[in-house]
Swiss-Prot record:
<comment type="function">
    <text>Late protein which is part of a large complex required for early virion morphogenesis. This complex participates in the formation of virosomes and the incorporation of virosomal contents into nascent immature virions.</text>
</comment>
<dbReference type="Pfam" id="PF04580">
    <property type="entry name" value="Pox_D3"/>
</dbReference>
<comment type="similarity">
    <text>Belongs to the chordopoxvirinae D3 family.</text>
</comment>
<dbReference type="GO" id="GO:0044423">
    <property type="term" value="C:virion component"/>
</dbReference>
<protein>
    <recommendedName>
        <fullName>27 kDa core protein</fullName>
    </recommendedName>
</protein>
<keyword id="KW-0426">Late protein</keyword>
<dbReference type="InterPro" id="IPR007660">
    <property type="entry name" value="Poxvirus_D3"/>
</dbReference>
<keyword id="KW-0946">Virion</keyword>
Length: 270
């Protein structure tokens, strides 16, 4: 998946591009969204916005926010419903209140979908925005070790619930959503976020063009480096830790006890 700095990204001519485009937006990238809207202003047939957050069971859920058309029966819309609705009734009701707004809540992802006509077909630009990468306001210490890196929690976000910190719920949800973004970038086939997008928000296919767009202020940060380039799958981490443990053992009993203590501590925290 291509990764681009916001101000260095060269736009494409969407009206000459037969593929659907999907963008993962990290940081304050409202400028990018607005530019896509302006580029396609005269060709947009449908646009809509959803939000994705985390419920009390720590599961992702989606909510419809707004659109330029209304489906009175469903009280929501997406491209799949739009096509179905047009077949039955012939047209949808224009929603004059459905203006696109920019959202920045750190405990939500916002999905902007622009649907436009291209060579007689409806094509889509889908933009999945994670507006903020939160950091703890105070120093965090776990098992005597100072945690300076938020990516520490990607393999096990539930550790945050065990820490006495301000706004822990907000930080927890932000980390969980970032973990889902990481999975979407690194291995779509097992991504819960991909499933929600494809089933409830916009149809995705193997021919879609995916790109990551990162705000200038975040592009060179270590948070971004680890979010987009590393795999935080827990099973892989467990396998790595077990392999490390086996490789460290020797004929020295005292040294093996120390290694075992460290191994058990790490295994417990993953």
């Amino acid at each position: 998946m291509e990764i681009h700095r916001l101000n260095s990204y060269t736009s494409v001519d969407y009206l000459c591009n037969s593929s659907n485009n999907v963008y993962i937006l990290l940081g304050d990238t409202d400028e990018f969204i607005n530019k896509r809207i302006i580029l396609l202003m005269n060709n947009i047939e449908l646009y809509y916005v959803y939000e994705i957050s985390v419920n009390d069971e720590d599961e992702l859920y989606h909510s419809f926010i707004t659109s330029n058309v209304v489906c009175p029966i469903k009280q929501r819309i997406n491209l799949m419903l739009y096509k179905e609705y047009k077949k039955v009734i012939g047209s949808c009701v224009i929603n004059n209140e459905g203006n696109i707004k920019m959202y920045s809540q750190p405990d939500k992802l916002h999905v902007y979908v622009l649907c436009y006509r291209c060579n007689g077909d409806i094509k889509t630009i889908t933009m999945i925005k994670c507006h903020q990468l939160l950091k703890p306001e105070k120093e965090i210490v776990i098992d005597g070790y100072q945690v300076n890196d938020s990516s520490f929690f990607y393999t096990s976000p539930n550790l945050i619930k065990q820490i006495n910190m301000d706004k822990s719920d907000l930080f927890y949800k932000n980390i969980l959503l970032r973990k889902e973004i990481n999975c979407l970038i690194r291995k779509q086939e097992s991504s819960n976020l991909y499933c929600i997008l494809n089933k409830h928000i916009v149809s995705l296919s193997d021919t879609d063009i995916w790109k990551v767009i990162i705000s200038d202020e975040l592009f060179d940060s270590s948070d971004i480096e680890k979010l987009v380039k590393f795999d935080y799958d827990r099973d892989k981490f467990h396998a790595f830790v077990r392999a490390w443990y086996s490789g460290q053992l020797s004929n020295c009993k005292e040294e093996n006890e120390t290694i075992k203590t460290v191994y058990e501590m790490i295994e417990k925290r993953i």
